[in-house]
Regions:
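Extended, subdomain-level signal for the structured scaffold at the beginning of enzyme domains
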Residues: 1-73, 81-93, 101-141
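Catalytic nucleophile serine of serine hydrolases
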Residues: 77
Length: 141
């Protein structure tokens, strides 16, 4: 799902791709999925500039919905910060990019390569994702 108004997307390096749908259309459908995966990249600075836009408001609603349904919440880099902004990290141990670590207030930011706490699976960055994947695969089976 694209966190945007359209499914026609471009990466920061200019690669064009099409998402299956937009985030707005995911609202109300958490019960149909096992997990929510948030791939961070450099989303946080962009999010900060556009937090009030409809697609980002929808993102926060979808994250909360998945958390309320007890779904797996998965992410890397500053995804833990997005989860924090969504208000779902109270007391949860989170692996987070070192630059985002000071912004984690309700969750417990760690320096670990990855953390698994309750239904949260977080990796510090894209280089630590491989160490998280075996545990995530077990949880998804």
């Amino acid at each position: 799902y694209a966190v945007a108004e359209t499914t026609d997307m471009r990466t920061n390096s200019g690669i064009r791709f099409y998402a299956d749908d937009v985030i707005e259309n995911l609202k109300g459908h958490a019960h149909e999925y096992d997990a929510l995966v948030f791939s961070c990249g450099d989303a946080v600075p962009v999010f900060k500039e556009h937090a009030s836009e409809a697609h980002n408001v929808a993102l926060m609603q979808v994250i909360k919905e998945f958390a309320e349904e007890g779904k797996l919440i998965i992410g890397h880099c500053a995804a833990a910060l997005i989860f924090e902004i969504a208000g779902i990290t109270e007391g949860v141990r989170l692996a987070v990019h070192p630059l985002a670590k000071p912004a984690i207030c309700k969750g417990i930011a760690t320096d670990s390569a990855y953390e698994i706490d309750r239904n949260f699976f977080t990796a510090q960055n894209e280089h630590t994702l491989p160490s998280l994947m075996p545990e995530l695969m077990k949880a998804l089976k």
